[in-house]
């Protein structure tokens, strides 16, 4: 008889760890931590351990992942992700998400952006199940363990496929910044259609990005960098920002070193290729 994977074996340490985290996550990810009966006042929550969230490095964006997504942005209940910003009287959100990290991985960029942009709601979108669970547990722990009650309340993650459903979550011109950090390079030519930057997808990004908003890209693969630059430069609604602008921008400084992939490249003394583009005004129709 074929043995069960450790992640599904009821007797394994990883299985027990996941079940325990999952039970806590169901309640804690949708409420204000200090209002939950699961956490006593002053009690610390351990940060999650990556070894218990094993996941393949990449996921096929064209597969049917049975994802949940709203029919339209108006149907999205953001209060479940950002309970601190829900108006207690009318139940409405006091802010909208304005910064998106597409393919956020283990959440390093969001966590560094949170204190840098305390007035903005920041969302990470990640297609892989266990990676999403890890980021959720990481944010729960950070929210609970931070002395300031505002700490990390402005970030969260959801499992979603940005290549298919981005306009289902965001209104026209809602976002001010979009990050594409170390995306899957899809080296084989027949796989290039699965890259996160394509002509078709750029039109969707332009739709949800406000005029003057910025697309940030970074990769350690030169071929992918050239591909992203080529497609963004060819699109009529994007214009590349100068090297001087990149050197002075706070987000670029954070993006270079905040992500887990960025730290890995740094350890290996590899190259990091950055390109930033601004969203141009939509031409008037005469």
UniProtKB/Swiss-Prot annotation:
Answer whether the UniProt record assigns the keyword Methyltransferase to this protein: yes
What GO molecular-function term can you cite, just one?
tRNA (guanine(46)-N7)-methyltransferase activity
Query: Which UniProt keyword terms apply here?
Result: Methyltransferase, Nucleus, Phosphoprotein, RNA-binding, S-adenosyl-L-methionine, Transferase, tRNA processing, tRNA-binding
What does the record give as EC number? 2.1.1.33
Q: Which residues carry this modification: Phosphoserine?
A: 7, 59
The entry's S-adenosyl-L-methionine-binding residues are 103, 126-127, 161-162, 181, 259-261
What is the predominant subcellular site recorded for this chain? nucleus
- Its EC top class is transferase
Give the highest taxon in the source lineage.
Answer: Eukaryota
Name the SUPFAM superfamilies on file: S-adenosyl-L-methionine-dependent methyltransferases (SSF53335)
- Entries under Gene3D superfamilies matching the protein: Vaccinia Virus protein VP39
The record's Gene Ontology biological-process terms are: RNA (guanine-N7)-methylation; tRNA (guanine-N7)-methylation; tRNA methylation
What is its subcellular localisation?
Nucleus
Pathway, per UniProt? Answer: tRNA modification; N(7)-methylguanine-tRNA biosynthesis
Q: Which reaction does it catalyse?
A: guanosine(46) in tRNA + S-adenosyl-L-methionine = N(7)-methylguanosine(46) in tRNA + S-adenosyl-L-homocysteine
Catalytic residue positions: 184
Q: Which GO terms describe its cellular component?
A: nucleoplasm; nucleus; tRNA (m7G46) methyltransferase complex; tRNA methyltransferase complex
Pfam families from the UniProt entry:
Methyltransf_4
How it assembles, according to the record, is: Forms a complex with TRM82.
Could you tell me what this protein does? Answer: Methyltransferase that catalyzes the formation of N(7)-methylguanine at position 46 (m7G46) in tRNA, a modification required to maintain stability of tRNAs; its absence resulting in tRNA decay. Both the D-stem and T-stem structures of tRNAs are required for efficient methyltransferase activity.
Q: What else is known?
A: Present with 2630 molecules/cell in log phase SD medium.
- Family listed: Belongs to the class I-like SAM-binding methyltransferase superfamily. TrmB family.
This one is known as: tRNA (guanine-N(7)-)-methyltransferase
Species per Swiss-Prot/TrEMBL record: Saccharomyces cerevisiae (strain ATCC 204508 / S288c)
Its lineage reads:
Eukaryota, Fungi, Dikarya, Ascomycota, Saccharomycotina
Which gene codes for it? TRM8
């Amino acid at each position: 008889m074929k043995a069960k994977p450790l992640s599904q074996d009821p007797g394994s340490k990883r299985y027990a760890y996941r079940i325990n985290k999952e039970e806590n996550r169901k309640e804690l990810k949708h409420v204000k931590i200090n209002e939950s009966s699961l956490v006593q006042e002053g009690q610390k929550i351990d940060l999650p351990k990556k070894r218990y969230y094993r996941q393949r490095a990449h996921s096929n964006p064209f597969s049917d992942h049975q994802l949940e997504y709203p029919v339209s942005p108006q149907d999205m209940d953001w209060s479940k992700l950002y309970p601190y910003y829900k108006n207690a009287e009318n139940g409405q959100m006091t802010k909208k998400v304005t910064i998106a990290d597409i393919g956020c991985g283990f959440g390093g960029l969001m966590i560094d952006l949170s204190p840098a942009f305390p007035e903005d709601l920041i969302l990470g979108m990640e297609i892989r199940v266990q990676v999403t669970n890890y980021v959720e547990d990481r944010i729960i722990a950070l929210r609970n363990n931070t002395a300031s009650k505002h700490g990390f309340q402005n970030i969260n993650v959801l499992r979603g496929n940005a290549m298919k459903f981005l306009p289902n979550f965001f209104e026209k011109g809602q976002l001010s910044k979009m990050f594409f950090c170390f995306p899957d390079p899809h080296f084989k030519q027949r796989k290039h259609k699965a890259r996160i930057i394509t002509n078709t997808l750029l039109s969707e990004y332009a739709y949800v990005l406000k005029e003057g908003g910025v697309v940030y890209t970074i990769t350690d693969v030169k071929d992918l960098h050239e591909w992203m630059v080529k497609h963004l430069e060819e699109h009529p609604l994007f214009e590349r920002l100068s090297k001087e602008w990149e050197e002075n921008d706070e987000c670029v400084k954070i993006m270079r070193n905040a992500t887990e992939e960025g730290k890995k490249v740094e350890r290996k003394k590899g190259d990091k290729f950055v390109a930033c583009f601004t969203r141009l005004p939509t031409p008037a129709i005469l």
